[in-house]
Structure formats: C-alpha cells, structure tokens
Amino acid sequence: MLRKTRIFLAAVFFTCITLLFLDFTGTLHAWLGWMAKIQLLPAILALNLGIVAILAIMTVIFGRVYCSIICPLGVLQDIISWFHGRMQKKNRFRFSYSPAKKWLRWFMLGLFIPTLLLGANAAVLLIAPYSTFGRIATNIFAPIYRLGNNALAWIAERVDSYAFYSTEVWVGTLPTLIASIVAFGLIFALAWKNGRTWCNTVCPVGTILGVLSRFSLLAPAINKDKCTKCGLCEKQCKAACINTKNGEIDYSRCVTCMNCINTCKDGAVKYAFRYKPFCHAERSEASADKVGRRAFMASGALLIGAAAKAQVESKLDGGLVEVSLASKPKRKTPLAPAGSLSLKNFENHCVACQLCITTCPNDVLRPSSSLHNLMQPEMNYDKGFCRPECNKCSLVCPAGAIRPVTIEEKSSVQIGIAVVDLDNCVVNTDGVRCGNCARHCPAKAITMVPKDPSNEKSHKIPAVNEHKCIGCGACENLCPARPFTAIHVEGIEVHKIK
C-alpha cells in the first residue's frame, strides 16, 4: 500500500510539473504553479524559508520522500528504470548493493556550494535537478508536444473545428539544446542501468537531503530476526543502499521508494520508527559522527549563505509574403523582465528552469548562449514584444528571479530605453514615410519630428522620450528596417518605477 501511494503521488507531481513546461497557453499555472515553487533550489534562491523548513522537516520525519515524489528529475529516472524492467523482465532484479561514492558526492556538493554563493550560475545549473529537468522538458519534450498539437490543429481545421490552434515549434539555442540532450542522455543511461545513481553521486540536492535522512524518524528498517538474507530487497533497491549480507541500510542514499518493503516475502522489512526495538539496521558507511558533522556544516553553509546573499541583494502582422527577421542587436546592457528588479538580481536568482520561456506567449524570452548567463532566459524582440498587459512570466517564476507584478505595476516599470539609429531608418535609406514605431508604442514615448527642422513638410523621423519609454520593444519588433532595425531597446541595470 505504501509503495502504491508513493507511485500515485509521484505520478501526479511528475505529470503536473511536466504539463507546466508543456503548456503554451499559460492556463495551468494558476492551478499548478505552486508545484514549481516547492522545489528546493528555487525555494532557497527565492528566500522561501518556510518551504525550505517544511522540506527539511519532512525529510527528517519521513526520509527522502522529496526525491521519490516531488522532484521531477528523480521520478523521470524511476520511469526510465521501470521501462527497462518491463522490457527485459529478467533484469527486474538487476540491482545490487554498492558502497557509497562519498568522494564524488562531496566533491560535487563542494563544487556546487561556492559556485552558487559566488554567482557562477552556469556551472551550478548544469547539475541542479529542477533546472536540468526544466531544460529537458523545454528543449526536448515541448517541441514534440507542440508538433502533436499542430497536427491536431491541422486536422481540426479540416473539419471546421477550432478546438486546437497552431503554435510555433522551436528549440533553444545550440548550447542549451546540446546541454539538454547530453544531460538527458547521461541520466537515461544511468537510470536504465543503475536506477538512482545520478541522485546519489551527482545531485547536490540529493546529498543535502541525504544528510538529513540519515536521522529520519521513519524509514525502511530490517528486522534481523525475520530476515532470511534472500537478497530480494537488495536486488529491488534502485538506490543500491541495502546490504543484505550485513543487514544494513545506508539511509543517506535511501529515497524511500518502498520497493524493498513490497518485495520482502518474510515481512522482515517495514517502514517504521527507526528508534524502536524493531529497527536493527545500522547506518552502514554513513554511521561516522564526523561525517555527519561535516555534512551538516556543508548543508548549513549552503542554506545560510544563499539566504544571506539573497537578503543582501534584496536591499539593493500577419501577411502573405515571407518576412525576414531582423538581426539581433548588440545591446550594451541586456534586458530583464519586469519584476526582476535588476539585471543582477535576475541573473543571481534564476535557476534556468526555463519555465518562463515556455509560458511567454509573445516569444520574447529565449535561452541565452552567452557564457556569463548560459541557459538563463534573455529578452529578444525579433519575434514579439513584451506586451504591457502580460505578466505571465512573473507569476510562474519559482526562484524569485522574476517577482510577481500586476498589470498596473508592470506598465509603470522601466526595463529599458529605446535608442534610434537614423542611419538604418527607412526614411533615410529608402526615402519613404514610415512612423511604424510611433504608431505602435503603447507608452506614447515616440513622436515623429521633421527630418529637416526648417521644413515642416519633410519626412519625419522618430524621437524617443526617455522618461516615458518602458522598454517593451514594440518599436524594435515592428521596425521594417533590415537587417538591423533602426530602433532597439537598451536594458538598464536597475529597473525604475515611473
């Protein structure tokens, strides 16, 4: 019963979180967005100490249920491992005990903590579990999902139905796509062969929670008086943490999947209070008190350091002709969405899960290929602009990189300023009248003034009122000049309230 309950809850969480990344309408986030906000690393970066405390207490009481139920990357590994067992039934009992690779676990955590505190997010986000799953879902699963949607839309259109509508199918930048494919391939290979190897060797969140789970009140426990040492529980343990020979369980690696309990035919393994007479399981390799103290210090450094860092920073047209996209302008200062407060706050808090990219209905947010903010979202106005009436990205960010803003608040936030390059303007290059930027500016920050001040009848060119401009990018997106637009938006380091 415990195993079935765990599988049901894991299936619910995995399905809902995956749908958050696949949903291009933005309708599911109002109901399911909280599932993204309870992921551990985003909660730490968002300074959601209540959620962090709840997850820590839950781990101390129940063990690593976060890894077996809530973490989508962990459940993905379980699905891959399950398929292997179903396809090759002789390998259903393929697991065996292996000593903990402590040096690798602590090396990865030791690499993770300082890089997180120093703001080297690219290195951190390559191994962060929620970030990794987000990239896999956005760059691998989502394009397949959208292709299926477009096929249904094509069929529906033939029968005069509008139940579906077509949407753009795109993948991230080449570095992001490569990182997603490599991560998925590596995780697939490890899970296919060894179950939860990634969680217990590479994943820093697994190592942190493993420290707490060593002292969990409830856990699978072996009754040595009943145990016949048949080895079935060990062969079903995807965490490779059960040593049948010695009757020991390494609780720092146990993900509380309940497979051992379900497999044992003698009732020798039960989920019980570890400190009752029933429980005779030793702590295996993780029993040394010195290791426990070092582990708590390392975990505490991550939580306290990240929280302090976050606290300090918080003070501070349709047509029939082919349309050629404009070349990306070289901005001196990148753009960050409204609600991110500043460029630094955005880059330091973003976990690159790319949930905002999936949610953006205007195709403004795309993964960055720049080294300093690799795989984090960046704003680009070649396919759309940041509409003042849209605040979806601020509502779905689980890490506090983009904080919630209302529609009214967004209209008063200046994220950038439009800059005019008259050398590219079609008024000068082609000698035609335009004014497209001024007509579509939602803030009325652009006016058309005579090219020749002494001749009121001369062609007019755009002039930007920097105090009114909010940096939405409508002017840049709709400018007809090619290959470079005659107007583009430069970001500002710290957002201003108008």
Tell me the role of every PLM-derived stretch.
Residues M1-G247, S252-R253, N259-K498:
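Non-ligating segments of multi-cofactor redox enzymes
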